[in-house]
Swiss-Prot record:
Native organism taxonomy: Bacteria, Fusobacteriati, Fusobacteriota, Fusobacteriia, Fusobacteriales
Role: Catalyzes the excision of an oxidatively damaged form of guanine (7,8-dihydro-8-oxoguanine = 8-oxoG) from DNA. Also cleaves the DNA backbone at apurinic/apyrimidinic sites (AP sites).
NCBIfam families: PRK01229.1 (NF002305)
Annotated EC: 3.2.2.-, 4.2.99.18
Parts forming coiled coils: none
Cross-referenced HAMAP family: Ogg
Protein name in UniProt: 8-oxoguanine DNA glycosylase/AP lyase
Gene Ontology MF, one: class I DNA-(apurinic or apyrimidinic site) endonuclease activity
Gene3D superfamilies for this protein: Helix-hairpin-Helix base-excision DNA repair enzymes (C-terminal), Hypothetical protein, domain 2
Swiss-Prot/TrEMBL keywords: DNA damage, DNA repair, Glycosidase, Hydrolase, Lyase, Multifunctional enzyme
Residue(s) at site: Important for guanine/8-oxoguanine distinction: K217
Provenance organism: Fusobacterium nucleatum subsp. nucleatum (strain ATCC 25586 / DSM 15643 / BCRC 10681 / CIP 101130 / JCM 8532 / KCTC 2640 / LMG 13131 / VPI 4355)
Amino acid sequence: MKKNEYFNEIEKIYKEMSSHFKERLKEFKNIWENGTNKDIHLELSFCILTPQSKALNAWQAITNLKKDDLIYNGKAEELVEFLNIVRFKNNKSKYLVELREKMMKDGEIITKDFFNTLPTVAEKREWIVKNIKGMSYKEASHFLRNVGFGENIAILDRHILRNLVKLEVIDELPKTLTPKLYLEIEEKMRDYCEFVKIPMDEMDLLLWYKEAGVIFK
């Protein structure tokens, strides 16, 4: 394990931007601490829309669906009309409805209450991967980070993986990312973050910022 030239490059950005990363992560924690069941449900729904779609578009779609409460009571054929800005809109509209049905009790959304019954981050993530259609480890990790549980997990999208190759954390971009390989790369990233003394959730925002020039979600 070493700090290569590329690390020196991103370390400069980190020193300039670390206070912004910390502030953003604090905002994520506040979503969980102060958010309602519906707030947390929106965050989970957002991560269903993100695969192969821009995060900004996915969040815009969620914002539009929230306006008329469609996200909480609309049928799949109604939701799909608002998903033109994300890919795989037909499947994703069905996934949103299935998610809502799972997270509803006595006519009320219980998303935050439900996840509070799963004591660890690992248990929360495993439940999502096994029970929510359209969500793999990447999307589950994304959701958990966005509600303040990202200290020890990785969101291994193509931007992060490409940067892990440049940092020599992994040798090459994986052709497919199986659950086993995901966890192996996550462990390597965890070790590397410890080595360079940059918290894992801050490293994620740093590498995203390096690629996109923005700190979003």
